[in-house]
Each structure stands twice: as structure tokens, then as C-alpha cells.
């Protein structure tokens, strides 16, 4: 009796082509001629990256990354981003492989990190989808040890219930803990005046006669003017204000004592041509401001009027 042999289904292949390869029909036709079109599918990488194409799940045994018309993988690898590798990894069968058309290694390429994040494992110059079996990702969780006196389940799978009353747990009242140094106010106290302290008895005569200890910050420093603190309480701020007032009064007194007599003034005839400013228009309403002008600082005057200067050394 002849023994029937089980025939394994043909392996399906997915070709991922860059956009420039589709523009060269002759190059694309020569690539497709090497594969059986009945078990081979062709998809464009730009359409996969844009989400325009949805790949079937667990369908392909092999996914090949095609080179462009110049036989370079640069364009294809640039389009193999996370949006492409995720669907490609899902479309691979367990133990399915992702590799390049020319067989060059992809482990050192730019898509190595994204391929690992998509769930693929580096293997023989490409990437392979691990086979986790039927219990893919199943992990048994134990939520505690089995109790010793727990009743066994019945034949139908039901578990008998235990309706024994549990002993009530005695709840002890919580005693508040008072922190150390904390007291309580006796509200029954009438707070008589006898309990108050006389402020006059806090300091004796000897305490009042003691010299005031000036802080180091308030003591005079060599070469610097004394400065009072912001919240000065030693009297330094008041003394500094008093000293400033005395200096200002003395300066005002000296200023008032400077007065010029009639003999200190000089008469000038402006009909005589003398020194003029650089613009020659000092009498048009502005004060004299030119450097070296004998009238610098004086108010403006009209031509020909008599002017008295405060300086006898003017040369006209």
C-alpha cells in the first residue's frame, strides 16, 4: 500500500520596493522574474510608510528589502521606519525572516534598533521572528499560597462555601499621644490679675546701668562710613541722621556767606568786537556753552546791553 506524503504549503514571500524602482519598469521586471508570482507579493515602501496598505497577519515566510535601480539599499533603509517595521513584523510567520535582496547583513544598518523594538531577533545577517508556540505571551500568575484547610473542589468544579462565623476582632481605642512640652489650658481658671507679671520687676537698677553691647556689624570700620542695620535698635541710625543734618546745615551756612560786592563786578562794552562763539549766534536766546567762551554759564543777553561779569580776568 503506498504511503501518502504530506506536502508542505509553498513559502510565501513579500518584496518591499523603494519608489524609484517602480519608475524603472525594466529593472522592476527583471527583479520580479526571479520569483514565483503565485506565492510572491510586491508592496511599495512609501505606501506602507503612509499607512495606505495593510499587510495580512502571520502570512509571509520571508520578507525581502529590494535595492533601487542603482543596486543601493540607502533609499529602502531610509523608509524602513517604525511605521513600516511594525506591520512587517506582524505579517511574518513564526520563524519568518527579514533580509535584504542581495543577502548583505542588516544587523549593522540603521533599522537594527527599530527591528528589535518591533519584536524581531538578529539572526544570520537579517532578522527573525521568534516562535513562541501556542501559548505566546501567556504567563501563569500566582496570587498567593494555597490554604491548608481550603475545601477541595467538587466534581462539577464548584467549591463549597464555608459559612462559619468568624470571631469579632476587638478594636482597641486609640489613645492620642501628646507631644513633649505641650500642655493644656485650664478653662476653669478665672485668670486673675494676680497671675500677671509686673514688667517693672523684670530688670533691676544694675541691669539698666550696664553699657549697651553694640553688635559687630554696627561698629565703625576703618576707611568706611558707618552704616546702620535695616532694623537698627542700638540708636546708630538716629545718630547718623543727626550727623547728616548737621553737615547739611553747615554747608548751607557757608554757601550763604559767599556774596559779591559791587567792586567785584566789571563793566563790559559789547559794541567792541570781542571773542564770539563758534556759531556767532550766542545772543539768540540760548546760554553760552562753547568751550573757552568767556561768558560760559551766563544767561543770554541782547546785543549792546550792559552786562556785568563775575570775573575780572575776561579778555575782550
UniProtKB/Swiss-Prot annotation:
Q: Where is this motif: Cx2C motif 2?
A: 290-293
Q: Where is this region: Fe-S binding site B?
A: 279-293
Q: List the disulfide bonds.
A: none
Q: Where is the signal peptide?
A: none
Q: Which residues bind [4Fe-4S] cluster?
A: 279, 282, 290, 293
Predominant localisation class? cytoplasm
Task: Motif Cx2C motif 1: list the residue ranges.
Answer: 279-282
Q: Name one GO cellular component term.
A: mitochondrial intermembrane space
Where does the protein end up?
Answer: Cytoplasm; Mitochondrion intermembrane space
List every stretch annotated Fe-S binding site A: 218-234
Cofactor dependence is on: [2Fe-2S] cluster; [4Fe-4S] cluster
GO biological process, alphabetically ordered:
iron-sulfur cluster assembly
Q: How does it assemble?
A: Monomer. Interacts with TAH18. Interacts with MIA40.
Q: List the HAMAP family hit by this protein, alphabetically.
A: Anamorsin (MF_03115)
The Swiss-Prot or TrEMBL record describes its family as follows: Belongs to the anamorsin family.
Which PANTHER family does the UniProt record give? Answer: ANAMORSIN (PTHR13273:SF14)
| Known role | Component of the cytosolic iron-sulfur (Fe-S) protein assembly (CIA) machinery required for the maturation of extramitochondrial Fe-S proteins. Part of an electron transfer chain functioning in an early step of cytosolic Fe-S biogenesis, facilitating the de novo assembly of a [4Fe-4S] cluster on the scaffold complex CFD1-NBP35. Electrons are transferred to DRE2 from NADPH via the FAD- and FMN-containing protein TAH18.
Report what the protein is called: Fe-S cluster assembly protein DRE2
Q: What is the lineage of its organism?
A: Eukaryota, Fungi, Dikarya, Ascomycota, Pezizomycotina
Amino acid at each position: 500500500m503506498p504511503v501518502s506524503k504530506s506536502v508542505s504549503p509553498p513559502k510565501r514571500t513579500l518584496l518591499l520596493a523603494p519608489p524609484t524602482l517602480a519608475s524603472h519598469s525594466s529593472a522592476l521586471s527583471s527583479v520580479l522574474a526571479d520569483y514565483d508570482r503565485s506565492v510572491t507579493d510586491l508592496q511599495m515602501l512609501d505606501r506602507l510608510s503612509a499607512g495606505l496598505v495593510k499587510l495580512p497577519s502571520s502570512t509571509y515566510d520571508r520578507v525581502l528589502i529590494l535595492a533601487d535601480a542603482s543596486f543601493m539599499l540607502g533609499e529602502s533603509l531610509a523608509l524602513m521606519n517604525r511605521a513600516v517595521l511594525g506591520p512587517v513584523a506582524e505579517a511574518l510567520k513564526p520563524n519568518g525572516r527579514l533580509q535584504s535582496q542581495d543577502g548583505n547583513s542588516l544587523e549593522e544598518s540603521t533599522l537594527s534598533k527599530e527591528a528589535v523594538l518591533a519584536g524581531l531577533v538578529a539572526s544570520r545577517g537579517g532578522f527573525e521572528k521568534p516562535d513562541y508556540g501556542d501559548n505566546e505571551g501567556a504567563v501563569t500568575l500566582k496570587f498567593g499560597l494555597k490554604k491548608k484547610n481550603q475545601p477541595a473542589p467538587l466534581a462539577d468544579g464548584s467549591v463549597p462555601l464555608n459559612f462559619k462565623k468568624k470571631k469579632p476582632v476587638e478594636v482597641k481605642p486609640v489613645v492620642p499621644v501628646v507631644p513633649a512640652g505641650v500642655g493644656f489650658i485650664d478653662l476653669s481658671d478665672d485668670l486673675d490679675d494676680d497671675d500677671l507679671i509686673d514688667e517693672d520687676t523684670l530688670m533691676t537698677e544694675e541691669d539698666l546701668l550696664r553699657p549697651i553691647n553694640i553688635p559687630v556689624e554696627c561698629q565703625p570700620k576703618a576707611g568706611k562710613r558707618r552704616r546702620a542695620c535695616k532694623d537698627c535698635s542700638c540708636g546708630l541710625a538716629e545718630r547718623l541722621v543727626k550727623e547728616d543734618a548737621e553737615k547739611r546745615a553747615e554747608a548751607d551756612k557757608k554757601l550763604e556767606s559767599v556774596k559779591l560786592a559791587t567792586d567785584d563786578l566789571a563793566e563790559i562794552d559789547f559794541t567792541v568786537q570781542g571773542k564770539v562763539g563758534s556759531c556767532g549766534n550766542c545772543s539768540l536766546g540760548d546760554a553760552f556753552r562753547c568751550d573757552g567762551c568767556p561768558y560760559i554759564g551766563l544767561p543770554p543777553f541782547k546785543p549792546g546791553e550792559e552786562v556785568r561779569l563775575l570775573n575780572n580776568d575776561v579778555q575782550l
